[in-house]
Amino acid sequence: GVDSIEHGSYLNEDPDLLRMMADKGIFFVPTFVVFIFHREVGTPEAQAEAGDFRQHHVESVQKALAAGVKVVAGTDAGGWVHGNNAQELECLVDAGMTPMQALVAGTGWAAECCGLEKQVGTVQKGKFADLVVVDGDPLKDIRVLQDKTRIKLVMKEGKVYSNLLSEQTAG
């Protein structure tokens, strides 16, 4: 069966499909960053169409959430520069999700969509300790996650890869 629908540009036009997705636990991964890519570096035709497609996507996200579909943050392998995943969270907020919903879309629901919810996606005993600590409150401004100067600690599987917190407290 189908586990997720990627892109889903015109899901907003089929409420029955959205209800079925919710009933069957099928995730929706809108990949807004693809439209940013086409708008910024696409052909003139792609640039012209990006705005219209984006509006369909916004409506698709809103209707999917209203139908009970889990919307997941994702990018497009090969279709966008990697390392900008936090930009997708901003796009989800711009589409009507709360910052908390966008964070869940990029963590817990994303892990569930990939079948990894027992290992990652939430901070729980027995799961890998994957954490990012930022200087700011992403629940007030999701864009703090995109500002690399505000990332103060990165931990993957319990191992600290970057720790600027100790520098702040030592000074």
Roles of regions detected by a PLM:
Residues 19, 103-104, 143:
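Generic structural signal for individual residues within well-ordered alpha-helical segments
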Residues 1, 19-21, 43-44, 86-89, ...:
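Short, glycine/charged-enriched secondary-structure capping and boundary segments
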Residues 1-4, 68, 128, 150:
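Short loop/turn motifs at secondary-structure junctions
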